[in-house]
């Protein structure tokens, strides 16, 4: 079975590292016709520069928690490629604290990046997909959106909102041929996790703890997750919509 995205155009947020970067690479390798990579830095991050010679990819820098950024990445996709088939709402941020220790600014940062960004991207891209009578929206969810985890005071509620918005959008826009799904990730081997391990003071013990939390006995690679995002964006997944698909090594089954 060959998964192909030939002829399709995608917008991927949080594209400069971790899951997002792996998605960008796999979408390009899967024959996508055009891709707009979005991240916070105003200029293209070095992680993406090696891909910049591929004329199928364009970069937009900005805060996804603002309407202006969503407007700009939508316009970039339409200007260069004429359509948008796939939207990946992947940008996310976590403040690792109990709820009572979050400042109002930290709460807003998490909610704006993880939740409000989905409103802004949908506000601009959904009308295009509705006119096309087709489209796929994939949202990066989390085990924190399905079960309580200590120190996820804002992040957990934000991912719960991502999961519920996925269901809402799926029902609302199914008549227009638009599929909406979320991938509920467990712990993924990304630079963020590596930094957290270093900050813990005992990286080996920290990583061992993360692995032990997953019944499968390990954490996932960003490439594994990107492979599933590629399948879910393809026509092979045409009957999936409204699903929160847990890719968590058995974590949520405990």
Residue ranges with predicted function:
Residues 98-99, 103-108, 210:
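Substrate-binding pocket helix/loop in short-chain dehydrogenase/reductase
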Residues 97-100, 147-153, 175-176, 217, ...:
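Active-site loop immediately N-terminal to the catalytic Tyr-X3-Lys motif
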Residues 119, 218-247, 252:
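C-terminal substrate-recognition "lid" of short-chain dehydrogenase/reductases
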Residues 127, 171-175, 238:
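Alpha-helical segment proximal to the catalytic Tyr-Lys
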Residues 142:
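Residue(s) in the substrate-gating loop at a strand-loop-helix junction
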Residues 28, 32-46:
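Conserved glycine-rich Rossmann-like NAD(P)H-binding loop of the short-chain dehydrogenase/reductase
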Residues 122, 158, 166:
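Active-site helix of classical SDR
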């Amino acid at each position: 079975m060959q998964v192909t995205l030939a002829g399709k155009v995608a917008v991927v947020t949080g594209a400069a590292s971790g899951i997002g970067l792996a998605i960008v690479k796999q979408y390009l390798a899967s024959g996508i016709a055009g891709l707009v990579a979005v991240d916070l830095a105003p200029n293209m991050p070095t992680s993406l520069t090696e891909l910049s010679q591929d004329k199928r990819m364009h970069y937009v820098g900005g805060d996804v928690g603002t309407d202006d950024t969503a407007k700009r990445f939508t316009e970039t996709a339409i200007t260069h490629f004429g359509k948008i088939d796939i939207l990946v709402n992947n940008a996310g941020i976590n403040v690792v604290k109990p709820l009572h220790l979050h400042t109002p600014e930290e709460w807003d940062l998490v909610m704006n990046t993880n939740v409000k960004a989905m409103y802004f991207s949908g506000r601009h891209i959904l009308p295009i997909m509705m006119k096309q009578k087709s489209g796929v929206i994939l949202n990066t969810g989390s085990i924190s959106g399905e079960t309580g985890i200590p120190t996820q005071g804002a992040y957990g509620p934000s991912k719960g909102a991502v999961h519920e918005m996925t269901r809402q959008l799926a029902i609302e826009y199914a008549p227009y041929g638009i599929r909406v799904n979320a991938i509920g990730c467990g712990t993924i081997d990304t630079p963020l996790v590596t930094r957290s391990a270093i900050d813990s003071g005992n990286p080996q013990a920290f990583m061992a703890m993360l692995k032990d939390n997953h019944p499968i006995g390990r954490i996932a690679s960003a490439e594994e997750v990107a492979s599933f995002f590629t399948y879910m964006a393809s026509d092979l997944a045409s009957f999936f919509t409204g699903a929160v698909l847990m890719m968590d090594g058995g974590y949520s089954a405990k």
